[in-house]
Design a protein with these regions (language model features):
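N-terminal signal peptide c-region/cleavage motif recognized by signal peptidases
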Residues: 18-20
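Solvent-exposed loop and edge beta-strand segments that line ligand/cofactor-binding
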Residues: 51, 101-113, 125, 160-177, ...
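Structural helix-adjacent loops and short alpha-helical linkers that scaffold large soluble proteins
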Residues: 124-137, 186-210, 248-266, 303-319, ...
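CBM-like, beta-strand-rich accessory domains located in the C-terminal region of large
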Residues: 24-26, 155-156, 177, 372-388, ...
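Active-site lining segments of carbohydrate-active enzymes
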Residues: 163-285, 298, 397-408
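Carbohydrate-active enzyme catalytic cores, enriched for enzymes
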Residues: 293-467, 518-522, 644
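Long, well-ordered core segments of solenoidal/helical folds
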Residues: 78-89, 136-154, 200-225, 260-280, ...
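Non-membrane alpha-helical segments in proteins
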Residues: 112-126, 138-142, 177-185
């Protein structure tokens, strides 16, 4: 980001920030608000007039420096919206969420409006002829006319609860903040042109963003995502804060309110950082890292730019570990370890990962960003992501040339261990997707976007899934309600886990792993834990010691040793796979090559047929989110114990 020069205050303040960060790394961090008082912010934050992060439409030469193919692609996207209809998000569709649990119909209309506006704005910035201005005006006006900028699933934050939005009480959710950001960037980029249409356009933008976002967030401390009253925070915190910060920096004209707002944003971000595991692990999974750790980076990058580099905590160990998490969770290609509400396949944000790596001076992370850019064909004729996210699109466009010239490097580390999150991953051969890959988790059953999955494992072979974590279906009203664990994808019986005496694992913080151990060496890596406490009393489990081992270049071994207080039903072990299983006899199950993958070899599961009887289930998939990872169907392998002992042990082997 570019800034106009500001008188230097000296190196001392940057050193103070870094030293404060390092000194408090083991306690309550307050990395930002601890050192950055409102008085200090007044000295270092650039004024509204001086902060110039990206070229405006009038700086035509700067926009023409973008790759020609990308410029052409952006203009084509804008042209599709010429004279477009701005579909109205109807009140009856808003009520879908409370009537039938559907959140998708309203979101489709709302998100489409914002994507259209962003596409038109970028097209106008590149072309600069005024051809898209009337459609931009229509987009601004229709969005400003909406009663609520958020989505039906989040309107319950208002005092009158779920249902229709209360126009008298604006509340701030993820997408209200996104909308404020979109309009703020539109005002910044096209301000003079909009004034040429009518000064009332920018006045309307300021009025709506002020009353819906800026004034509300400054006045209220009770939004749970702020964490200011001790609430547990998640990705909502940095996601909203990053967009709120953009709106403050670009639209808040009153200097004291501008500083007050930034100071409050720092306090909110500190609640996120204070609660983050020191190992950098995101318990929401790699998909949500894009709006957890990566949105934290968005915020830190904005603060760095808006202070001429004087706000800089990129050397802090926690910040560095938060960045490195996403590369550690990468398995191969588009596949990632997907515990919790994460999809197995991701198109991770190449630009954010590259820039995060550059800021923390991590060459491997920068190489990963370059790898993703090549994987996604960035710089040829595409740019990644929804155009509704101008806060992500703009920095991506202006780092694109550097990003596409960087040396790509896929992160294929030998193994990793996140001790606080209790997640491990290991591969047969460092630097290669060939051979078997193992990931497993401990943790507890009250994690953010939790599944009841303590002790679950994932196995890949030559970069393709073998034993899987199914992930999550498209969100509905049930997903974040007290009926969440009625959904099959959340249940331990549909993870690679045992059902004991007819009982699945239970949700709650007390249902957790104990005695967790991890050991890695050149020939093997092992992970062990006791999962007994993840089950309710009815399961009558005294101990259930699970050990998973990757013998590099050879096999994965799953070993369970257990003691029960009572045995009423046989143990039933679930193994989930996207590969079609075949019982071949002699305690062997053949897992076929994945559908459509010609170069993948079959994999075999070996079990003691004296201990187990095996059955196979096919699970047809109708949900679009699941189909995007697993195509038309999944398979559930059920191994049922032939005896009901109080003590027992067994081993299951996975081999190529």
């Amino acid at each position: 980001m570019r800034t106009r020069n500001m008188p230097a205050l000296g190196l001392w303040f940057w050193v103070l920030l870094v030293c404060s960060s390092l000194a408090t790394a083991q306690g309550k961090l307050n990395l930002l608000s601890g050192a950055l008082t409102p008085e200090k912010l007044k000295q270092i934050i650039l004024s509204l007039q001086d902060w110039h992060p990206f070229p405006k439409v009038s700086e035509h030469e700067e926009w023409q420096k973008l790759p020609e193919k990308v410029r052409a692609a952006c203009v084509r996207r804008a042209e599709k919206n010429l004279n477009c209809e701005w579909e109205t998000p109807k009140a009856s569709i808003f009520l879908d969420f409370v009537r039938n649990g559907n959140r998708s119909r309203y979101e489709a209309v709302s998100f489409s409006r914002r994507a259209k506006l962003a596409e038109l704005v970028i097209g106008e910035c590149i072309e600069g002829k005024g051809r898209f201005l009337d459609d931009i005006l229509n987009g601004i006006w229709t969005i400003c006319e909406e009663t609520y900028w958020g989505v039906p699933a989040h309107v319950s934050a208002q005092k009158k609860g779920s249902g229709l939005p209360d126009a008298a009480e604006p509340t701030v959710d993820l997408f209200a903040a996104e909308t404020g950001m979109l309009l703020a960037w539109t005002d910044y980029l096209l301000g003079e042109q909009l004034d040429g249409v009518s000064p009332l356009v920018r006045e309307r933008i300021l009025y709506e963003v002020q009353r819906r976002i800026l004034s509300v967030n400054l006045a209220r401390d009770d939004f749970w995502w702020m964490g200011l009253n001790g609430q547990k925070v998640n990705n909502w915190n940095p996601w909203i804060c990053s967009n709120w910060l953009i709106a403050v920096l670009l639209l808040e004209k009153e200097p004291d309110r501008r500083i007050q707002s930034i100071s409050k944003i720092l306090k909110c971000l500190d609640q996120f950082l204070n609660s983050y595991p020191k190992d950098g692990g995101c318990d929401e999974g790699p998909g949500y890292w894009d709006r957890a750790g990566a949105s934290l980076y968005d915020s830190l990058e904005l603060l760095h730019g808006a202070s001429n580099g004087r706000i800089n905590i990129f050397e802090n160990p926690l910040v560095r570990e938060i960045g490195r998490y996403i590369g550690r969770l990468h398995i191969s290609g588009r596949y990632y370890i997907n515990f919790a509400d994460a999809a197995a396949k991701l198109n991770a944000n190449a630009s954010v990962i590259y820039r995060f790596g550059k800021s923390i001076r991590d060459q491997d992370m920068m190489g990963f960003g370059a790898f993703l850019a090549k994987q996604q064909n960035l710089g040829e004729d595409s740019i990644r992501g929804s155009f509704g996210w101008l806060g992500r699109v703009l920095p991506m466009l202006f780092v694109l040339d550097e990003l596409t010239k960087a040396t790509p490097k896929e992160p294929l580390g030998r193994d990793f261990w996140l001790p606080e999150l209790q997640i491990m991953g290991a591969r047969s051969l460092e630097g290669s997707e060939k051979g078997l890959y193992l990931a497993a988790k401990g943790g507890h059953n009250a994690e953010s976007h939790n599944h009841n999955d303590v002790g679950n494992l994932i196995v890949y072979a030559d970069g393709y899934p073998v034993l899987i974590d199914v992930g999550v279906e498209s969100y509905t009203a049930k997903t974040f309600s007290n009926r969440r664990y009625e959904i099959w994808t959340m249940q331990s019986a549909y993870h690679n886990l045992p059902t004991i005496n007819g009982f699945m694992q239970k949700d709650g913080r007390e249902f957790q792993a104990t005695d967790v151990k991890y050991k890695s060496g050149p020939k093997a890596v092992s992970f062990s834990l006791d999962i007994a406490k993840a089950y309710p009393e009815g399961a009558q489990v005294q101990s259930w010691k699970r050990t998973v081992t990757l013998e590099r270049g050879k096999q994965v071994i799953l070993e369970d040793r257990y003691i029960l207080k009572g045995a009423k039903q046989p143990v039933q072990m679930t193994l989930m796979s996207g590969r079609k299983p075949e019982l071949t006899g002699e305690g062997k199950i053949r897992l076929a090559s994945p559908e459509g993958i010609l170069d993948a070899k079959p994999v075999f599961i070996h079990f003691d047929q004296g201990q187990w009887s095996a059955a196979l289930e096919t699970i047809p998939l109708v949900d679009g989110q699941l189909r995007s990872s697993w195509r038309e169907r999944l398979y559930r392998i059920l191994l049922t114990a032939k005896q009901i002992p109080l003590r027992g042990e067994y081993s299951i082997l996975i081999k190529q």
